[in-house]
Amino acid sequence: WVDGVQKRRKLMDLKEYFDNTNGIGVLSTADSDGKVDAAIYARPHFTDEGTLAFIMRDRLTHHNLQSNPHALFLFKEDGPGYKGKRLFLTKVREEQDTELLESLRRRQYINEKDEAKFLVFFQLDKELPLIGGGKK
């Protein structure tokens, strides 16, 4: 029970951090053969069920997650220096073209192609600072 409360508190702290911090994010994945990919992604969405979620199209990142559920989200804060976070993630589920996905979208594009969109949910395995190994 305590562990669940601590995890929820950690996610709430992360939500507040991302709500109040501008920067650039990169989501890195690898396929089942270990071939890696990195792509620019917006800040994660945080769910009531204690997961993080990203909206993605059916491109290489989504493809990689079908055979390897592990990912890393690297976030570098705007400004001088190297402040930010690394979030180690494991995919737990996804949904396609749902009302929830549409409600979470931060941007709408006028000339957007009618392609499938996926809301991919992750559990947070570990959080580290952008630089260094964190507290020991």
Regions found by a protein language model. Give the residues of each.
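Binding-site signature for planar aromatic cofactors or substrates
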Residues: 4-136
